[in-house]
């Protein structure tokens, strides 16, 4: 069965201003083997939506379904496990551990999810080779370029073989050349039947996706699927 992620009538508002909906009645289904971009101006709800999709935040109304399983946002412990098992998350800020080498940064994410050191290092070596960084495995973050560091962030997201990869403005700190290389790697992951979702303010990179979702003031205003 192919993986899917479905939003039903999903809304979000914060306690400080309950009359303002950061997300307003979002309905959509994300399917495996496809890449989705979320575009919209600052404050449109992109990051809030990604945080709910990855179970970091919770909606005020509506629900989230992963592979026919409705998420109970009150069960924090279970959701932490679901996030670890199903999701790989890439942030704009790479947040690499400065005292860890490239391979250690990747393997640490595997160990944190219950893998042995030996297994994590073995998988990390394969990932570094796949990302074209085999010869940078012993380098520390300060010795890596911005593009290399962001590829390590991809590797860290991949080590637990996630079904869903979510990235929030992942190329925001990269120049155009490195950003293009980053998105080439990211988009290639869909061949492994994953769901890839990323938010960006850059229309060029948004248009690389199979489907582009536009958020305006918390509402899903348009859906443009590549034919």
Residue ranges, per PLM feature:
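Conserved ABC ATPase signature
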Residues: 140-144, 148-150
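ABC ATPase NBD coupling module
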Residues: 71-88, 191
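Helix-to-loop junction immediately C-terminal to a conserved catalytic motif
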Residues: 54
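Short coil-to-helix segment of the ABC ATPase nucleotide-binding domain corresponding to the Q-loop/switch region
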Residues: 100-108
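Conserved ABC transporter NBD signature motif
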Residues: 62-73
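Conserved signature/switch motifs of ABC ATPase nucleotide-binding domains
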Residues: 84, 139-142, 160, 192
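Catalytic Walker B motif of ABC-type/P-loop ATPase nucleotide-binding domains
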Residues: 165-168
């Amino acid at each position: 069965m192919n993986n899917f992620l479905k939003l039903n009538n999903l809304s979000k508002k914060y306690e400080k201003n309950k009359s303002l909906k950061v997300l307003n009645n979002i309905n959509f289904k994300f399917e495996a083997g496809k890449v989705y971009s979320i575009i919209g101006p600052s404050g449109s709800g992109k990051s809030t939506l990604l945080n709910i999709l990855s179970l970091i935040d919770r909606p005020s109304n509506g629900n989230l379904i992963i592979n026919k399983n409705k998420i109970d946002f009150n069960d924090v412990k279970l959701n932490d496990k679901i996030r670890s098992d199903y999701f790989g998350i890439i942030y704009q800020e790479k947040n690499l551990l400065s005292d860890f080498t490239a391979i250690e940064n990747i393997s640490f994410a595997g160990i944190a999810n219950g893998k042995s050191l030996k297994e994590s290092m073995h998988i990390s070596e394969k990932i570094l080779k796949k990302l074209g960084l085999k010869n940078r495995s012993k380098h520390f973050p300060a010795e890596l370029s911005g593009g290399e560091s962001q590829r390590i962030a991809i590797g860290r997201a991949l080590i637990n073989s996630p079904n869903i990869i979510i990235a929030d403005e992942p190329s925001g700190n990269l120049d155009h050349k490195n950003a293009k290389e980053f998105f080439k790697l990211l988009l290639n992951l869909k061949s492994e039947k994953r769901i890839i979702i990323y938010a960006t303010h850059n229309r060029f990179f948004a248009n690389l996706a199979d489907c582009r979702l536009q958020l305006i003031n918390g509402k899903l205003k348009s859906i443009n699927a590549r034919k």
